[in-house]
Amino acid sequence: MQVDIGCCKGESVILAYNFLHPGEELNEGGDFFEDYPVDLGKPILVPGYTFMRIRTIVEPYGLLPDLLNMIIFDALVANSDRHQDNWGLCFKEDQVRLAPLYDHGSSLGWSLNEDRVRKIMSNNRMFEAFINRGMSLIRLEEGHKINHFNLITGIKNREDMGLRNATKTISAVNKDSVWNIIKLVPDDIMSDLRREFVFRLLLERKACIERLVN
């Protein structure tokens, strides 16, 4: 999905472009849950929001590999907000695809201020604890919230080869590729300290994922 970083009335903003192809219609994940109370005004997690239930939605369209790719990506960036309205399927006549992934605001240590980042970066034990703390909204069993790595471990017992293939999608993540992206972020958006933090976070989480899957 194409995005741009900009400034509006003195505030830093992200412009996310419409990703729908002509004639396509987006159905968000919540549309597939008959017990989702859509009239509450804000998203709440639907009952039974588990990997297996989401699988029953996407697998008839041949999109299980795309679901696994999404789970691996969320684990990589520590996305803690992949609720049912933060993904969807794009329909056009008899064609269906998983929508490009969107809304990753709750990723990469988004809630940490600079002082907290500095403290974590200066203490290896704190950094390791932070790496393992990222929680997934997608669960293995209803009511049991787990971190991304435990989710991957549970899925591996069901979809070993599919998960191995999904992990290949992050094979290009290395020191050079990550830094070449991070260095493009303007200084008023990301400090040098946070660049180093995100750089280390991505590489460490990639290593954790590969150890679990391979």
Predicted features along the sequence, with ranges:
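Conserved ATP-binding subdomain of kinase catalytic cores across diverse folds
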Residues: 1-38
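Glycine-rich loops and low-complexity Gly/Arg-rich segments
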Residues: 26-29, 39-43, 114-115, 123-128
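Short alpha-helical "patches" and their helix-cap loops
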Residues: 2-9, 83-92, 214
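Amphipathic, charge-rich alpha-helical segments that serve as recognition/docking helices
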Residues: 28-55
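Conserved kinase catalytic-core segment
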Residues: 46-113
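C-terminal catalytic region of ATP-dependent kinase domains
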Residues: 90-214
